[in-house]
Design a protein with these regions (language model features):
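Short polybasic/polar patches that bind polyanions
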Residues: 39, 50, 80, 172-175, ...
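Short, contiguous, pocket-lining structural segments
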Residues: 26, 40, 155, 159, ...
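DNA-contacting interfaces and partner/effector-binding or oligomerization modules
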Residues: 132, 136-223
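Short, well-ordered alpha-helical segments
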Residues: 32, 114, 157-165, 230, ...
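N-terminal low-complexity or simple alpha-helical regulatory segments
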Residues: 1-145, 166
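Generic solvent-exposed, charged/amphipathic alpha-helical segments
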Residues: 117, 121, 164-168, 172, ...
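Extended mid-to-C-terminal alpha-helical interaction segments
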Residues: 191, 196-282
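Short hinge/gating elements
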Residues: 100-107, 149-153, 221-222, 238-242
Length: 282
């Protein structure tokens, strides 16, 4: 079903200078829990948010986005204010398919889990141009992962904790509330306290991984999605495709990113790069 998958790694890179600031942005839907988590620790959210030019109501605006680097700074502020080094993990409890707007609705109405994940991967750029969803199959196991391709992100561990927790939520929406991954991959050092991770993810944990993601058996991809609406899926796919066509992804940067991802997956060729970008091979 899903054979031409990609992989990515968490690389160590120097901090960005202003001259090298990325244009990558991310929609705030998956981050709407930030004010709630801050206030859980007794930290007023508005002073923290205004530091990066945001307001609480921005997180309730579907199309509101922020620069990837600003959100990196925001994670740093949140950690300092709360003293919690698993802030991203706590934030992940608020992530759902609805967090991803049209892409999430498209996935929710796909015919199967595999088709839903393909939709998420194919249209993820509409919501996050600083990272990519990665899917691969090996020896009967699927790896569903997320990789950052913006250099200089200092709090990548928080982003990956958020992403992995969000993946578990998405899979439970598609497969049922009792679903659990076989393994959770976390590209961060093993923390002193494992309890928050065990309670939140309910699965075996693998720290110091080269990938952020979850692993589950391949047959899960064939599971049908309950109450999926095929007609609505068709309409949403047309709208999502039109929205994607209107994006200006800075082609040269996208080519470099595609080549790096495909090299890591050992699938790099002119044909694969063209397919990855939706272009003719020539």
């Amino acid at each position: 079903m899903i054979r031409d998958m990609r992989a990515t790694v968490n690389e160590t890179v120097p901090p960005l200078t202003p001259a090298h600031r990325s244009s990558a942005r991310v929609h705030l839907g998956p981050l709407r829990g930030i004010p709630l988590v801050l206030e859980h620790f007794g930290v007023p959210s508005e002073p923290v948010l205004t530091t990066v030019g945001l307001r609480r109501e921005d997180f309730e605006t579907p199309d509101r986005s922020a620069a990837f680097e600003d959100l990196d700074r925001l994670f740093g502020l949140c950690i300092r204010k709360t003293g919690c080094d698993h802030f991203g993990l706590l934030l992940s409890q608020y992530v759902s398919l609805q967090s991803f707007g049209i892409t999430g609705r498209l996935a929710r109405n796909a015919t199967s889990v595999g088709a839903a994940l393909q939709d998420l991967a194919g249209f993820f750029l509409l919501h996050d141009s600083g990272g990519s969803i990665n899917l691969s199959i090996h020896n009967g196991s699927v790896t569903f992962g997320y990789g950052i391709h913006v250099p200089g992100i200092r709090h990548a561990d928080q982003v990956y904790d958020l992403a992995v927790g969000g993946m578990v939520n998405v899979m439970r929406e598609l497969c049922g509330p009792d679903w659990r991954p076989a393994v959770v991959l976390l590209p961060r050092k093993r923390p002193p306290g494992l309890r928050p991770y065990r309670e939140r993810l309910l699965s075996p944990l693998r720290f110091d991984s080269v990938l952020a993601g979850i692993i589950f058996p391949e047959p899960v991809l064939s599971r049908p999605i309950v109450d999926a609406d095929s007609y609505l899926h068709t309409l949403l796919a047309e709208n999502a495709s039109a929205a994607l066509a209107r994006t200006d992804p800075l082609l040269h940067a996208d080519v470099r990113r595609a080549i790096r991802l495909l090299l890591l997956a050992q699938q790099c060729s002119r044909r694969e790069v063209a397919r990855h970008l939706g272009l003719h091979e020539r």
